[in-house]
Amino acid sequence: MDIQLGAPGQIIPPVDRGISLGIKMEKLGYDALWWPDHLMGWHPDTMWNEEFTPLARHQPSSHVHVDPFAMMAAIGAQTEQIRVGTCVTDLLRRHPASIAQTMLTLDHMTKGRAILGLGSGEQLNIEPYGIEWDKPVAKLAEGLEVIRLLMNAGNEKVDFEGKHFRLQDAVMGLDPYGDRHPEIWLAAHGPRMLSLTGQYADGWLPTKMSPEAYRDSLDRIHTGAREVGRNLDHFVPGMLGYLLVGPDEESVNRLLASEMIRMLCILMPNWVFESLGVPPPLGGDAGFHDFIPSRIPRHEVDRIIKAIPPKVSAHYAFAGTVEQLVEEIASYHAAGLRH
């Protein structure tokens, strides 16, 4: 089974330990390190205590996140093979011109190993910080075009007139390290995002879904590529998934029933809950894009957790013994998964 394996980069201080861990991951043979680009974590303040998780003894807040690009630079400059990427950032907080410059700089620091993971964004990183949460997918679509234009600008001036971004006599004199620009991977789930992935991206990084849904979504990506005449021979279909490993079924079931894991299931799209016969826990049309943990009282935390049965956790994470996980991942490989 030919499949790459990534690992999460450390997101909390001390950063020197995070750098050492990244170097160790390369020695262990991992193919990539990935960092989320968050200002706020997914777990509400009201549930971050030792009763909920032992992590609270060592981490006073659930909202500790170092800057991913700084960690990518530090580790990328001290390694030779492992790739470094964001999983993911957005173009609501970060302007596409700044992203293009940052990624080209990282391209040189890592000698071509930096990956820009992009998504449409989540309100928890946007609205509480005074940034407008409006038309995130439309802004991503335009921003992708702007990034590509600037990364390929050479010494030419660039003009672009969009609804959300505008360039006039813009320049980006920094060339890529090698003969191609840094790769862009999209965290896509819905039809429009999947189409954008086929049109612009070099890789795909969704959260876990069934092998059947993965295969169907990958087909949509290829359809999007064909519509613009793109060749996806070097495209990398990936997936972001948690691993819950235990020696036996009983220990795995305890992990699946834990409040910490069940709370993370809010990251799944509403259609996944519906496909499992479970009402979306946030109610109505609200989904994880609308979730702002710093505003969730404890009684609402309890309600959400109770609304997420362990069978949902089993769908969200790769859970089982080592042998079971190998078998499950093989089913995704058959559906097209390569990272």
Task: Give, region by region, the residue ranges found by the protein language model.
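N-terminal beta1-alpha1-beta2 module of alpha/beta enzyme domains
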Residues: M1-Q78, I82, P182
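Hydrophobic faces of well-ordered beta-strands that scaffold small-molecule active sites
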Residues: I3-A7, L33-W35, V84-T86, A114-L118, ...
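Short, acidic/polar
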Residues: P13-M25, I99-T102, A187-L196, L256, ...
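Short helix-capping segments at alpha-helix termini
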Residues: L28, T79-I82, M109-T110, G154, ...
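An alpha-helical appendage that flanks or caps ligand/catalytic pockets
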Residues: D134-D175, E212-A334
